[in-house]
Amino acid sequence: MKLYIIQNLNSHWKNNSSKNIITKLAHKFNLEIPQYKETGKPILNTGYISISHSNQFLVVIYSNQPIGIDCEIIRPIQQSLIDKLKLDKLNPILDWCKRESVIKLLDDKSYLLKKELNEYYFETVSFNPLLCIVLASNKAIPTIEIIHLDSELNFINLTQ
């Protein structure tokens, strides 16, 4: 399982800007280029992929098992949203990321409103203290190889 963290050092990622960079990523690392369902979920013929972005970070996970990923810059969340979604009051960003990663795993937005997610496996990736990254799967999550790149796909850091 490989997690590519792509950092745009000059600005924030825009919606849909990920498709172009993922195609470049696939060419650079000899990976399959995803197709996209009508819902926007990326799919592969061989294996699984999930994508998320927040501000200057784009995260892409390639896996041989079903996987979902979410990343969020750690920031305050409005109390009204915490109450509406019944997010964990101590760590609402982590709770949000767990729900979003399950949404991406299952391609089902109803999981944003679900509090109990005990049937899934979660892995939190510690990469940057200002960024929350959560993986979700319906199977135990194996070791993750982290590859940190800049927006030109040059290596910044490789961690195993």
Regions found by a protein language model. Give the residues of each.
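Core catalytic alpha/beta fold that binds nucleotide/phospho-ligands
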Residues: M1-Q160
